[in-house]
Amino acid sequence: MVSIRPDEISNIIRQQIEQYDQQVKVDNVGTVLQVGDGIARVYGLEQAMAGELLDFEDGTVGIALNLEEDNVGAVLMGDGRDLQEGSTVRSTGKIAQIPVGDALIGRVLDALARPIDGKGDINTSETRLIESPAPGIIERKSVYEPMQTGITAIDSMVPIGRGQRELIIGDRQTGKTAVAIDTILNQKSEDVICVYVAIGQKASTVAQVVEVLRERGALDYTVVVAANANDPATLQYLAPYTGAAIAEYFMYNGKHTLVIYDDLSKQAQAYRQMSLLLRRPPGREAYPGDVFYLHSRLLERAAKLSPELGEGSMTALPIVETQAGDVSAYIPTNVISITDGQIFLSSDLFNAGLRPAINAGISVSRVGSAAQIKAMKQVAGKLKLELAQFAELEAFAQFASDLDQATQNQLARGARLREILKQPQYSPLPVEEMVAVIYAGTNGYLDDVPTDKVTEFVQGMRDDLKANHAKYGELVRSEKKMGDEAEGILKTAIADFKKSFMAAV
């Protein structure tokens, strides 16, 4: 029989007491009252914060948006099919945040920065809140460096600077995404990190964009954030803020970034859907009252930082879709008033074969002219004036039959200037070539070239400049202006090329 020694028992009890670790964990737990349409009403989460992440028992994550007297209205970031009345909900005490860092470059992510490209997990230790306050006045510097898009019509007449917000607006199928993608492609040698945010688009469209970027080597400096049309409205609402947070990380590390939100109309629609289901009162066009703040707090995060903060920048190109060219609708007017200018794409111009279909008359850049390089300023002023006069005369010429010679000359030149602004998709131009083309157009070198041969002439002239007059490009790139030497080389080059071209026509 085993004898029990009292001292041994007391030792065991003492050891057990020493090892006992009492941890009291207080959980804020609630119960689902009602669930459906991506919305859950939860009872019992007294300590919930606005925007706090909630864990539902089936693994779905939600965000507390409505804090009411007796319940919390939460939006779900999943389908929530297994949720039912009585399911438990825990508050996490956290606000939505995402991983950030260099490891994200070249990846395709969802609205919570989780990879969806099948290339494995993202290894990064840093995180950033999805919603962050925008830089204050003292933390900013005015825009002064150019953000070249490589599109002649934009860089000459509607210039964009680093840190600017420039809206791209137009009807469906007018080439809005094409302008944005060309701008990304043009950053290849500029050391700019690009973030493309696709909101509410078909997965096939996003795949096409990713393929274009990959083929042309642009995915090496681009992050793609996609909330597809079949994703919950919550993710479509969050995607632009995720893109902004990723770009902000690089901006605060002294780098230059470009963010494209394609498009904010769909984000506003997703937010309207969430708000109406949460029973928030509808306003104009059934959008909630804070839809202006939805976009202003997003676009105000784009900035050019002061030297003390490293002079990084975040340039935003939001896209908004109009219905039948109506720029006076609610969302277009809101975003126009928030941004520093807009590029208006017209379906009439697009169908008439002018692509990119930029309507120079109502497109404007409020701060970009300060960032335009001197070489472009020297030639762009005349281009703008002549195109404006041409547009006026063209309307008048439809009714008048007998026009004097000066008017006919002006119409002929205007038609050729319009031709030089045509550009194929995915072929952005370096700034020195754009300057040369505009110089040739505004100084009368194209006046006797047949209109249908202008594109061919311009292409040949650019090739000739690259092959035989490389010094011109070097001078413009280094001096950032059209000096006497560069202008001399250009004049000779255009005259020589024109002679051989006209002989062959």
Swiss-Prot record:
Keywords: ATP synthesis, ATP-binding, CF(1), Hydrogen ion transport, Ion transport, Membrane, Nucleotide-binding, Thylakoid, Translocase, Transport. It comes from the Bacteria. ATP binds at G170, D171, R172, Q173, T174, G175, K176, T177. PROSITE patterns: ATPASE_ALPHA_BETA (PS00152). One of its GO terms (molecular function) is ATP binding. It catalyses: ATP + H2O + 4 H(+)(in) = ADP + phosphate + 5 H(+)(out). It is found in: Cellular thylakoid membrane. The keyword Transport applies. One of its GO terms (cellular component) is plasma membrane-derived thylakoid membrane. Its EC number is 7.1.2.2. The record marks S363 as: Required for activity. Produces ATP from ADP in the presence of a proton gradient across the membrane. The alpha chain is a regulatory subunit. Belongs to the ATPase alpha/beta chains family. F-type ATPases have 2 components, CF(1) - the catalytic core - and CF(0) - the membrane proton channel. CF(1) has five subunits: alpha(3), beta(3), gamma(1), delta(1), epsilon(1). CF(0) has four main subunits: a(1), b(1), b'(1) and c(9-12). This is ATP synthase subunit alpha 1. It comes from Acaryochloris marina (strain MBIC 11017). The gene is atpA1.
